[in-house]
Amino acid sequence: MKKILAAILVGIFLVGVSGVALASTAAEATALVDKAIAFYKANGKDKAFAEFNNPKGQFVKGELYIFIWDLTGKVLAHGTNEKLIGKDVSQLKDVDGKLFVQEGVDLAKAKGSGWVDYKWTNPTTKKVEAKSTYVKKVDDLIFCCGIYK
């Protein structure tokens, strides 16, 4: 009986820990966006975008990285994939057909900030996973950082 109770308690603990890990990752994503916005305001667009596009810079932290869209869904900066810079990704769909970039643009324009949920291939696991991207509008830019759940 004690072994069963111990196993149940371990299971409850692990579920609780995974929830905390997700919350801290979401907090890290929003903090990275806020840090990027502060850097942009302090240093201007050119210097900020050069740093955002640097895969070894201060705005790429493990799986977290900054990317910037304009108000139409064009990529202006990307911390891990420079090939996307200048591309209109507004019509990009996830595996379920969701126009998640357009949803993010619409959300940022309407509310200023928020989270967009969609499914995307995790480059680490190579599997389609649930992902959430935090978007925040500043001037005519949308600062973004995503997390896998």
Regions found by a protein language model. Give the residues of each.
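N-terminal membrane-sensor/transducer module of prokaryotic signaling receptors
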Residues: 2-149
